[in-house]
Design a protein with these regions (language model features):
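Glycine-rich loop-to-alpha-helix module at the N-terminal edge of alpha/beta enzyme cores
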Residues: 40-82
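Active-site-adjacent loop/helix segments that line or gate small-molecule/cofactor pockets in enzymes
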Residues: 1-29, 71
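Short hydrophobic/aromatic-rich motifs at helix boundaries and adjacent loops
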Residues: 2-3, 32-37, 57-63
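Active-site and channel-lining beta-strand-loop segments
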Residues: 23-43
């Protein structure tokens, strides 16, 4: 898909509560993200979603994968061992 196709699909199906950049991100690695048109960007916005480790850090991916195999989410009504 292209950036424009992703944006058009989003506009048709997602509530828009704030303005957005006209970029559709496909993947990230380290501090860089790539859009669906293959253009690479340096991510200076990680504080918005608290993504301070960058993208696809191997240790983070392994830890999340292991946790998802046990319990990916539960309400804070319950106790769990992180």
């Amino acid at each position: 898909m292209t950036n424009q196709q992703i944006i058009e699909r989003d506009n048709a199906h997602v509530a828009h509560t704030y303005g957005r950049n006209q970029i559709a991100l496909e993947q990230g690695k380290g501090m860089h993200v790539t859009d669906f048109d293959g253009k690479e960007y340096l991510d200076f916005t990680s504080g918005i979603g608290v993504n301070s480790l960058g993208y696809c850090d191997p240790d983070w991916v392994a830890a999340v994968s292991e946790q998802a195999g046990r319990l990916q989410h539960t309400s804070n009504l319950y106790y769990t061992d992180p």
